Structures are given as structure tokens and as C-alpha cells.
UniProtKB/Swiss-Prot annotation:
Result for mutant: K266R: Abolishes sumoylation
Localization: Nucleus; Cytoplasm; Nucleus, PML body
GO BP terms in the entry: autophagy; circadian regulation of gene expression; circadian rhythm; energy homeostasis; gene expression; maternal process involved in parturition; negative regulation of cold-induced thermogenesis; negative regulation of DNA-templated transcription
Positions marked as site (Important for interaction with CLOCK): L132
Superkingdom to which the source organism belongs: Eukaryota
Phenotype upon changing L102E: Reduced CLOCK binding. Abolishes transcriptional activation by the CLOCK-BMAL1 heterodimer
Residue stretches making up the bHLH domain: 79-132
Protein name (Swiss-Prot/TrEMBL): Basic helix-loop-helix ARNT-like protein 1
GO cellular component, one term: nucleus
Role played: Transcriptional activator which forms a core component of the circadian clock. The circadian clock, an internal time-keeping system, regulates various physiological processes through the generation of approximately 24 hour circadian rhythms in gene expression, which are translated into rhythms in metabolism and behavior. It is derived from the Latin roots 'circa' (about) and 'diem' (day) and acts as an important regulator of a wide array of physiological functions including metabolism, sleep, body temperature, blood pressure, endocrine, immune, cardiovascular, and renal function.
Organism from which the protein derives: Mus musculus (Mouse)
Effect noted on mutating L157A: Significant reduction in nucleocytoplasmic shuttling
Chain segments carrying region Interaction with CIART: 514-594
């Protein structure tokens, strides 16, 4: 019994001993301190195998073995922090090295006198990548020069091979910085006459905008001022000379007209001094094909002392280095033998009145005209007068039908005044929404002499023979035959004022469209594809006025004599129709510009229009709506 009491008391004393309580409270206190320390900003919680070293170290502080482990734990934390800082330092160093390497690859960063910040380097790198535009394998100019040739020898070889002249033009002001001596053979100007002058003074006025466009957008050296992101001040540059790099975005090739210095005409008669002075001062132009690159040099390297302004400090001098060659148009030569070569052709687009609205660049090699010389002019101004009648008929057909029209061979005047033989395929483009013809597309092919003699099966000839201009212009009864006026300075062969023909044909077709525009049957078809309609009844008011008043003044349909019943697409196909009494073409209005109509003719024309409205639209009586597909 006594032994049992002693065991119970010992058990109670062991249970009531403070050791476990202190251990529990110490553990809770340690964990609380550890949590507070983590909340205050401890960067990292280092744990191994999900066991907190701090808890174990705080628990066994009094134990020597525990103190040793605590010291080792603190050392590990310190080493981990140092390793983390070393990793961050290595990362920053690597990023800085990449930024420096990127700055060395960008040409604009190399020109800076001071070290740029990272944001400026990245912005310049993005700007440089945009200028490359996907160019691959950029090359340096030094790689293209053989080692055994000097610069002067290479220049002479290039000029001899190109058969032109070398010139350097500043992109900012168009100043001629250098030109080779061979320019005298082409432009008849000496080297000293051109160096230092503005290129724009020797260009045709219509080509100045085109050349300025070619000189602008310098891809090699942007002209804008660079701002430092830290200080906000402009960055000053110290340009270091190096091999300039060429890219596809800096390549230039264009045509322009330049003045040719002709020998002055000596005028001895004082009475004609005012008229001859204009001819003496007038300089002829020749077409120059310029091919080269946009490059940049330091202003000090070019030896220019005038660009010492503060704005120009730190900017490269952008220049156009090009070879200018005289561009002579290609005159087709008769082919010898039966060698088949690809025919020369160009594409042009015309308004409905025949004016050029687009010309392919290939036309320059065939016609010697630049595209801007032809734009806005009528094609009838270049047609030979013997072919105008046939081409006018083709013009009507292409406006009234959707089919392709192939013309016969005709003569087209080129720039030197001679004529070249062409054959064209015309088709009209009709707007699907407005149902109106917007423009005419013409594919013009040069016809060689042997093809013209033997005939070409690929180009079928039209059945209607070409009509000359004289056969289309009515002459007075018993009067003399019309003579074609000649214009001083313009070679013969074309007709003065022929550009009005296309406008008259367009107005004629539009007038027919207006007459037929209110007919319900024409709503689903093309407005220019007009179907035949019987003539108005003589019992109608319009018909009585027509019978009493004669033929109304309505634009002619353009039918040639004897073709009234063969050509479809006109309002009246019967020879006794209203328009059949005036079948000839109205080109004689070119010489008569009065064009005024009398009141009686206006009333007769209005009567015809009203009669057509009554006959086609049913305005003269009640209308039956039972045939409509929708309920009313």
C-alpha cells in the first residue's frame, strides 16, 4: 500500500514538474518571435526539410551542442544572403555588358561623346532596327573594292562602264557637293559650274517634288536631336569615322529631267530681241536615270565649313551618291529572221473622256514621256489624225459594253515628234454599286514592222475599217475640203484640239444614260448597256411636237454612215428613228465652240424626254400594280 502511494506521488510530481511547461512556452514564444521577425521584413525564410532552425536553436540555447548548431545556422543565413547579392550583381553586370554590346552595334550610339543611359540605347536600337526594314546581310563598301585598284581608278572604271556621271547631293538642301567631269558630255555643264549649286535649279519644275521625296527619309543618319533621358538635355556627339554601312532602305533609283546647256543664240536684230530672248534663255531638258545610295559622312570629313550652326552639331551629313545616265527611249527595230522576243508593252488607265489618270513606268522606255507628262492629257492628242475615227468608235464600244475591245494598229506620237505603231486592248471597269463606268484600262503593245506587214493572229482585226478624220467631219455643200490647222512648234500628224473628242463622247454616253435612266427595265442592267426601245407614238404630245418642229437637238449616237442597224446598244435601231436623221459623228463641234441652243430646240428635247417617260414608266395613265412581287 505504501509502495503504491509512493508511485502515485512520484507520478504526480513528474507530471507537475516545470520542464515540459517551460518547453511548451519556450516553443510558443520562439515561434511567435519568429513570426514577428518574418512580418517585419525578413527577406527570405531559409528552412531545410521543413524544419525551422531558429526554433531548434532557441530551444537548445543552453545546450553546447545546440549553440554550435545555432552558430552554423546563422552562418548559413549570412552565406545565403551573400550568394543572393552575388547573383544579382552578376545579373546586372551581364545586362550592362549586353547593353554595351548593343550600343556598339548601333551606328548612332557610336557617334555619341558620352556614355548613354540604358533607355536611350534601347530606343536607338529600336530606331535602327526599323530603318533596316528586314534587310539581310548588310555590307560595307570596302568589301566591294578590289585591293589592287585605287579609288581614282575605280571611279574611272565605274564611269566608263555606266556611261554617265557621278554626283553627290546633300539631302538637307539639295546642294551639289561633287560631280565628275564626265557631266560635260551629257549636260554640257563643266564641273565647276555645278559644284556648290542647288540641284533643284537644274531640274524640271514638275520633277522637283519627286526628287525631294527621294532625298528625304534618310535611313542612315536621322536628323532629329537626341535627348538624354536622365538630364533632359540634347546629347552632343563626337563622330568617329568608320566604314559606312549600306542597307536596302537607302537604295535609290528614279528618273528626272535636267537642264541641258545649249549654246546661246546671238541676236543681231534689235526689233526681235524680246521674242528671241525667250528662246535663247529656254533650256531643253533630257531624262536622267539616277541610281545610287543614301550615305552619311561627318561634316568635317567633307570639308564643309558652313554647317557650324548649333542645330547641326552632332549630326551626320546625309548625301545621295548616285550615277546619272542619259535615258534614251527604245525605238523598236525590225527584227531579223524569225526570232520571237517578248513584245514591249505598257499599261495605262484613262478616265471616261480619254484622259490619262495612270501610266505604267514602262511607257518611258517606249514613248520617252515621263508618267507625269502624260497625266491629265487626253489620249486623242497623241493619236494620228487618220486613226481618230476608228479609235473614237472603239471608245464608244468600250463605254457601252463590258467586253474587251481590241483596236487596229494605230500611230501614237512619241516625244521626239515621230510616230510609233501600237495596238491596244481596252476594257472598262464598272463600279458594282453605282453601275457606272469609272475608268478604262488600256494595254498597249508595240507592233514591229514585220508583224505589221505579215499580220499577227493573236490580235484579230476589227471588221470596221479605220475612218480618217476627214471622212467624219462633214464639209459644206460644194465647199472646199477642210484643212488641218498646224500649230507652230508641234510636228504634223495630230489634230489641234483633239482632246475635246473624248469629252464629247463621254457626254454623249452620259446623255443617253440620262434619257434611259428613269426606265424600270434598265434598273437591273448597266446604265451604258442600253437596249433598243420603239420610238414614241406620234399621238403623244411629244410626238406631235417632233413631227411639227423637226428633228430635236439631241446628242448624236456616234453611228457611222451605214452602221445604224449593225451596232447594238443604241436607243433606236430603226433607220426612221428620231436619232437616225442625224447619223454622223459630232466631231465637227471641235471647230465650232458656240454650242448654244435655241428655245425651240430645248422645248423639242424636253418633249422627247417627257414622251419617253410616259411610254416607259406609264405616267400617262393608270398603272396596274397586280404584277408586283410584294403586297401593297
Amino acid at each position: 500500500m505504501a509502495d503504491q502511494r509512493m508511485d502515485i506521488s512520484s507520478t504526480i510530481s513528474d507530471f507537475m514538474s516545470p520542464g515540459p511547461t517551460d518547453l511548451l512556452s519556450g516553443s510558443l514564444g520562439t515561434s511567435g518571435v519568429d513570426c514577428n521577425r518574418k512580418r517585419k521584413g525578413s527577406a527570405t525564410d531559409y528552412q531545410l526539410d521543413d524544419f525551422a532552425f531558429e526554433e531548434s536553436m532557441d530551444t537548445d540555447k543552453d545546450d553546447p551542442h545546440g549553440r554550435l548548431e545555432y552558430a552554423e545556422h546563422q552562418g548559413r543565413i549570412k552565406n545565403a544572403r551573400e550568394a543572393h547579392s552575388q547573383i544579382e550583381k552578376r545579373r546586372r553586370d551581364k545586362m550592362n555588358s549586353f547593353i554595351d554590346e548593343l550600343a556598339s552595334l548601333v551606328p548612332t550610339c557610336n557617334a555619341m561623346s558620352r556614355k548613354l543611359d540604358k533607355l536611350t540605347v534601347l530606343r536607338m536600337a529600336v530606331q535602327h532596327m526599323k530603318t533596316l526594314r528586314g534587310a539581310t546581310n548588310p555590307y560595307t563598301e570596302a568589301n566591294y573594292k578590289p585591293t589592287f585598284l585605287s579609288d581614282d581608278e575605280l571611279k574611272h572604271l565605274i564611269l566608263r562602264a555606266a556611261d554617265g556621271f557621278l554626283f553627290v547631293v546633300g539631302c538637307d538642301r539639295g546642294k551639289i557637293l561633287f560631280v565628275s567631269e564626265s557631266v560635260f558630255k551629257i549636260l554640257n555643264y563643266s564641273q565647276n559650274d555645278l559644284i556648290g549649286q542647288s540641284l533643284f535649279d537644274y531640274l524640271h519644275p514638275k520633277d522637283i517634288a519627286k526628287v525631294k521625296e527621294q532625298l528625304s527619309s534618310s535611313d542612315t543618319a536621322p536628323r532629329e536631336r537626341l535627348i538624354d533621358a536622365k538630364t533632359g538635355l540634347p546629347v552632343k556627339t563626337d563622330i568617329t569615322p568608320g566604314p559606312s554601312r549600306l542597307c536596302s532602305g537607302a537604295r535609290r533609283s528614279f528618273f528626272c529631267r535636267m537642264k541641258c546647256n545649249r549654246p546661246s543664240v546671238k541676236v543681231e536684230d534689235k526689233d526681235f530681241a524680246s521674242t528671241c530672248s525667250k528662246k535663247k534663255d529656254r533650256k531643253s531638258f533630257c531624262t536622267i536615270h539616277s541610281t545610287g545610295y543614301l550615305k552619311s559622312w561627318p561634316p568635317t570629313k567633307m570639308g564643309l565649313d558652313e554647317d557650324n550652326e548649333p542645330d547641326n552639331e552632332g549630326c551626320n551629313l546625309s548625301c545621295l551618291v548616285a550615277i546619272g545616265r542619259l535615258h534614251s527611249h527604245m525605238v523598236p527595230q525590225p527584227a531579223n529572221g524569225e526570232i520571237r522576243v517578248k513584245s514591249m508593252e505598257y499599261v495605262s488607265r484613262h478616265a471616261i473622256d480619254g484622259k490619262f489618270v495612270f501610266v505604267d513606268q514602262r511607257a518611258t522606255a517606249i514613248l520617252a514621256y515621263l508618267p507625269q507628262e502624260l497625266l491629265g492629257t487626253s489620249c486623242y492628242e497623241y493619236f494620228h489624225q487618220d486613226d481618230i475615227g476608228h479609235l473614237a468608235e472603239c471608245h464608244r464600244q468600250v463605254l457601252q459594253t463590258r467586253e474587251k475591245i481590241t483596236t487596229n494598229c494605230y500611230k501614237f506620237k512619241i516625244k521626239d515628234g515621230s510616230f510609233i505603231t501600237l495596238r491596244s486592248r481596252w476594257f472598262s471597269f464598272m463600279n458594282p454599286w453605282t453601275k457606272e463606268v469609272e475608268y478604262i484600262v488600256s494595254t498597249n503593245t508595240v507592233v514591229l514592222a514585220n508583224v505589221l506587214e505579215g499580220g499577227d493572229p493573236t490580235f484579230p482585226q476589227l471588221t470596221a475599217p479605220p475612218h480618217s478624220m476627214d471622212s467624219m467631219l462633214p464639209s459644206g455643200e460644194g465647199g472646199p475640203k477642210r484643212t488641218h490647222p498646224t500649230v507652230p512648234g508641234i510636228p504634223g500628224g495630230t489634230r489641234a484640239g483633239a482632246g475635246k473628242i473624248g469629252r464629247m463622247i463621254a457626254e454623249e454616253i452620259m446623255e443617253i444614260h440620262r434619257i434611259r435612266g428613269s426606265s424600270p427595265s434598265s434598273c437591273g442592267s448597266s446604265p451604258l448597256n442600253i437596249t433598243s426601245t420603239p420610238p414614241p407614238d406620234a399621238s403623244s404630245p411629244g410626238g406631235k411636237k417632233i413631227l411639227n418642229g423637226g428633228t430635236p437637238d439631241i446628242p448624236s449616237t456616234g453611228l457611222l454612215p451605214g452602221q445604224a442597224q449593225e451596232t447594238p446598244g443604241y436607243p433606236y435601231s430603226d433607220s426612221s428613228s428620231i436619232l437616225g436623221e442625224n447619223p454622223h459623228i459630232g466631231i465637227d463641234m471641235i471647230d465650232n465652240d458656240q454650242g448654244s441652243s435655241s428655245p425651240s430646240n430645248d422645248e423639242a428635247a424636253m418633249a422627247v424626254i417627257m414622251s419617253l417617260l410616259e411610254a416607259d414608266a406609264g405616267l400617262g395613265g393608270p398603272v396596274d400594280f397586280s404584277d408586283l412581287p410584294w403586297p401593297l
